[in-house]
Amino acid sequence: MRRLIFTFCLLLWAPSIPLSAQNTLSSIRQRYAEQQEAIRHMEAGSMPREYYHVHGAVNLPATGQHDEDIYLYYEEVEERADENAIYLPHRLTFVTTAYNYSFRRFYEEFLYDADGRVAFIYARNPDIVFGLDYDFRFYFSRGKLLHAIVKRGINKDADAARLIANGTWNASLPTDSEGHQQVCAGDKLPKEFHSVLADCLKSAKRYHKLFQDTDRALYGALF
């Protein structure tokens, strides 16, 4: 009975996400779902394709062939258009990028708000611990980190038995439907992942500039 009362008290005092933050998270997730739905329609041919596809192939010293596929999705912005404009200006909404360094494969997504600030980042990073893939989800409000979720799972090409035997992977911990274990979740990001967040934010700015330059070169010529 004492244990039940103690557990109940812990639940009452456990930190919760403020209502305003919950609303922001819900809004970001809704916009993300809408973007995914739009991409599915584009791929099916049921709506016009509105993106730039950039592919880079570079032979890097020591690591060899490096390939990167970047998709820059955009939308038309009526409220910023001149009243006599035939072509409406574009605004970046979403970016996906898949790339490799040697045999390690990375994947990232960036969702932007109407002001061009990143609102959500998803990053799959195989570089934190050898043999494991780390999944990072960063949510932002007005450019500041609002919520972070970090999970990890065994890389599909890794020797799972060896990772368990050497203590890299604790098989006794619970996993989700994808076989991932949650490392942390909340508005405070552990210091060991600060560099990952910093790199992701730099990438968000770099891809936004890439969109602006590409849009100006390919679409701006029509004005």
Where are the language model's segments positioned?
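Short beta-strand-initiation
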Residues: 7-8, 105, 133
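Long terminal segments
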Residues: 22-80, 130-223
